[in-house]
Amino acid sequence: MRYFRLLVLGNGISAYGSYLNMVALNVFVYDATGSALAAGLFMAVRLATNVVSGWVSGRLVSVYDRKRLMVGADLCQALALLSLLLAPDGMRVGLLYALAVITGGCSTLSQVSLRSSIPEIVGAEHRVRANGLLVTGRSLAMIAGFASSGLVVVKLGYSAAFALDAATFLVSATVLFLLPVRTKAAAAGTGSAESSDAARWTARMLLGTAPVLMAMIAVRAVDGLGSSSHNVALPIYSSGLDPDHPATFISQFWATWAIGNIVAQQVIGRVTKKSGRTPGERAFALGACVMSAGFIVVFCGLPTVPAVIAALIAGAADGFTEIIYVSRLQTAPDEQRGRLFGLSASAENTGFGLGMLVSGALLEAFSPLQVVAAFHGLAIALCLALLLVLLRRGGTRDPGVEDKTVDRDASTVTEGRG
């Protein structure tokens, strides 16, 4: 865990760059072209790349060294941003769409590589704690990135924003390169052909041997729909609350959400350390229900204090479910883990991208509460169905998953206890 904390720091710095990049580039596209269509197309290209790169990333991390992939992904993003920074003004617009492909693909590759590597970096018994640290780091990076992006662009300009963004990726790549960590399991004596076959059939095998795990991935995809709905609806809702200061509620919401994430990391880390067991699929389904319900309550027009409390609960449940979900996928054998996280990334990005399009259209005719309730209500319904199936299957089985159940030599993914 000593080296992993440095890795979390580097990952948090690059995550800050990603969120700064997300805001600065979208605004730059609109300012440079004067076209909302061009800005929307830029976002669509990036989201589509995120979806496709999930499948590609799963293949890459199953074959190549993950540390090198993460370093390469950070360097590619830094070089792409520096190219945009140094390009003449007349060429920048054309480079933007190439940049959307590079940043979208590299960010997904980096995420899939890191999540697949955690059991090898820290050991399977420490994966829950490690996932919690990553969730906390990225939550803080998101708040810092969104909060500072406007200030950086307004006060320093786009060139400074792109330079700062590139610097964060260079720092992250340097930290990763220098850390003496192993990101892939030692090669087994059965040869690479068998390992490749195991990875190739992961998705098909999951349908037959781990339907609950596939259901969890489906829940995460629908959660992506819900997440996109409250992201799109939040500025509209905030403007309705205070037209003169719409950013006030947005800042309160995201700051409280981040605090909830940190609380979740602390709680689940202590519970796991004390009990020696990781909350399983049932806890995941229940936590996802609480998360979606919390987001719905935020948009119910409550006074500030109850709304902030709802955001805190939603943030805690969000962090809780993400830690459980990632930790559960990490119980898969190393040669299959990359494909599994690639599939998960594609599903989550598909849900989020589709939700951005649909919720944006629905908000033209319906209120923020109606749209958010519809999308998160769908997630709640799916989670309740999953919870019912788990309860029927589980009977009197223990609801936790022991950390020691990870078998590095296993050849198939099996269901854990929920």
Tell what function each PLM region has:
Residues 1-418:
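Alpha-helical transmembrane-bundle signature of multi-pass membrane transport and export proteins
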